[in-house]
Amino acid sequence: MIIKEEYFPSGDLSFLSQLGLRAEELIFFDIETTGLSAHKASLYLIGSVVYEGGSWKLQQLFAESLTDEIEMLEHFFALLSKKRRLLSFNGERFDIPFLEKLLSQYGLSESFQGVESLDLYRELRPAKKLLSLPNYQLKSCERFLGIR
């Protein structure tokens, strides 16, 4: 497994408190796979962002082979166990179920229990007409929210 890390300045975090969130509690995550079925596809990337030491830390876990999936899962869930809120984009429909199926396939005991999930796609979708977005792809939502 290859681990890549990069730090970014935190900027103004006041918007988080207005939403009832604390940066230290959050973990943003996304996965990349070779397909949609956890039984047939492979997990090759878990990306996460956490607030650490006054900066945002981006961590990417890359699989070099199929055998790296277990190590990636264990590493990610060790990080997740220190956080209270999980933020994703369409994570509740794809990323979380995909990882849960892999955990089950490998007989691993890690889980998402005790972590509150906030799926940005699910939160934005009901406001489709109000927001007048061209579509609900991640890039369109990022632009609307002012995220680079």
Predicted regions and their residues:
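Conserved DEDDh/DEDDy metal-dependent 3′-5′ exonuclease domain
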Residues: 56-144
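RNase H-like nuclease fold core
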Residues: 33, 37-52, 57-58
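C-terminal or mid-to-C-terminal helical accessory/interaction module adjacent to the motor/catalytic core
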Residues: 146-148
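Two-metal-ion RNase H-like nuclease active-site motif
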Residues: 25-34
